[in-house]
UniProtKB/Swiss-Prot annotation:
Disulfide cysteine pairs (residue numbers): none
Residue(s) carrying N-acetylalanine: A2
The name this protein goes by in its record: F-actin-capping protein subunit alpha-2
Protein family according to the UniProt entry: Belongs to the F-actin-capping protein alpha subunit family.
Molecular functions per Gene Ontology: actin filament binding
Gene Ontology, cellular component aspect: cortical cytoskeleton; F-actin capping protein complex
Residues that bear Phosphoserine: S9
Primary role: F-actin-capping proteins bind in a Ca(2+)-independent manner to the fast growing ends of actin filaments (barbed end) thereby blocking the exchange of subunits at these ends. Unlike other capping proteins (such as gelsolin and severin), these proteins do not sever actin filaments.
Record note on quaternary structure: Component of the F-actin capping complex, composed of a heterodimer of an alpha and a beta subunit. Component of the WASH complex, composed of F-actin-capping protein subunit alpha (CAPZA1, CAPZA2 or CAPZA3), F-actin-capping protein subunit beta (CAPZB), WASHC1, WASHC2, WASHC3, WASHC4 and WASHC5. Interacts with RCSD1/CAPZIP. Directly interacts with CRACD; this interaction decreases binding to actin.
Source organism superkingdom: Eukaryota
Single biological process term from Gene Ontology: actin cytoskeleton organization
Length: 286
């Protein structure tokens, strides 16, 4: 280990540490951070050199955060990043500071939204919240309305997780949907992501994503929001069903092929009658 320390520069150590942190499984950021901290053995170097990794992890994972004084959680995403550690809560029209290491929101202040697209954003958010409440018991969603390349754009983000450390597994669902508000029809683009980590007597990760494209009829705000939710629901249901079916197929075929069905003797042991076996008698006489 001493030779390795001599070979690696501080910059290289931080680069490796940052990679570990960015790729931490959902719900296991603190565990990975603490392990990396012990390995690096230099808190100042870790905090200063890997700060970007803390931020990138939260942005990638759509980390939900509760703001004191407000009922609903908001997601930390690149779409709400205002710079200098500040983020947007479009529903409550506030901005706030976010500590990427502690995952805490502070200093909420009023923030003026894009008025030209706000009515569309609100309609989509209302419909999406109802959808998320029905399909994701622990789900959180945030909807942004902004101008991108001069076009009014709606961006909808969904996050839902189950952290079961006592049962040795953690998992997170993320989806992101975008469409521009254009007359008659527009293109909806989405990406769905699933990440699950199971680590009891082993270490298995499921990391999957799917890109979606569909056309959306644009009319008034409320009707367009309803049609948008139909697209989201159909795509996410289809993806989740496909994942479940593939997982069952793997369980029935691939995983079974990895283990021996019977001992080398091709005979199952009846443990209730172990004393009747020769080995049992030998153990009894020993």
């Amino acid at each position: 280990m001493a030779d390795l320390d001599e070979q690696l520069s501080d910059e290289e150590k931080v680069r490796i540490a940052a990679k570990f942190i960015i790729h931490a499984p959902p719900g296991e950021f603190n565990e990975v951070f603490n392990d990396v901290r012990l390995l690096l053995n230099n808190d100042n170097l870790l905090r200063e050199g890997a700060a970007h990794a803390f931020a990138q992890y939260n942005l990638d994972q759509f980390t939900p955060v509760k703001i004191e004084g407000y009922e609903d959680q908001v997601l930390i995403t690149e779409h709400g990043d205002l710079g200098n550690g500040k983020f947007l809560d479009p529903k409550n029209r506030i901005c706030f500071k976010f500590d990427h290491l502690r995952k805490e929101a502070t200093d909420p202040r009023p923030y003026e939204a894009e008025n030209a697209v706000e009515s569309w954003r609100t309609s989509v958010e209302t419909a999406l919240r109802a959808y998320v409440k029905e399909h994701y018991p622990n789900g959180v969603c945030t909807v942004y309305g902004k101008k991108i390349d001069g076009q009014q754009t709606i961006i909808a983000c969904i996050e839902s997780h189950q952290f079961q450390a006592k049962n040795f597994w953690n998992g997170r669902w993320r989806s992101e949907w975008k469409f521009t508000i254009t007359p008659s029809t527009t293109q909806v683009v989405g990406i769905l992501k699933i990440q699950v980590h199971y680590y009891e007597d082993g270490n298995v990760q499921l990391v999957s994503h799917k890109d979606i494209q569909d056309s959306l009829t644009v009319s008034n705000e409320v009707q367009t929001a309803k049609e948008f939710i139909k697209i989201v629901e159909a795509a996410e249901n289809e993806y989740q069903t496909a994942i479940s079916e593939n997982y069952q197929t793997m369980s029935d075929t691939t995983f079974k092929a990895l283990r021996r069905q019977l001992p080398v003797t091709r005979t199952k042991i009846d443990w209730n009658k172990i004393l009747s076996y020769k080995i049992g008698k030998e153990m009894q006489n020993a």
